[in-house]
Amino acid sequence: MTEPTRSIDDLSPARVTTAFDLPGHTTVRSLGVAQGIVVRSRSIVGSFGASLQTIFGGNITLYTSLCEKARQQAFDKMLADARKLGANAIVAMRYDSTEIGSGVTEVICYGTAVRVTQDA
């Protein structure tokens, strides 16, 4: 599905990149770091189901799903933070995660919030 036409002032996932500049655009102002943090824990039922999956090997789908949801939530929070800063793009976006306790994981998504103009 094609993304609807957006104004240059709108921040959309299409204007988020891991590169240090957004192709086809010129960075006119850096607004600081935008970030989104999510702390997730596994439920007892989920941990039990995942431990059963480890017996058979392969992808542990319960944990994969948990990680994907946490990354998406952190990404969405980063977008909201960047919008508060007045950004219409994010460059140098990264993810990081850390286990901060038994079964508790922090996922952070961060990048540089910027204002860009479209190249002629």
Curated annotation (Swiss-Prot):
Belongs to the UPF0145 family. This is UPF0145 protein Bcenmc03_5217. It comes from Burkholderia orbicola (strain MC0-3). HAMAP family: UPF0145.
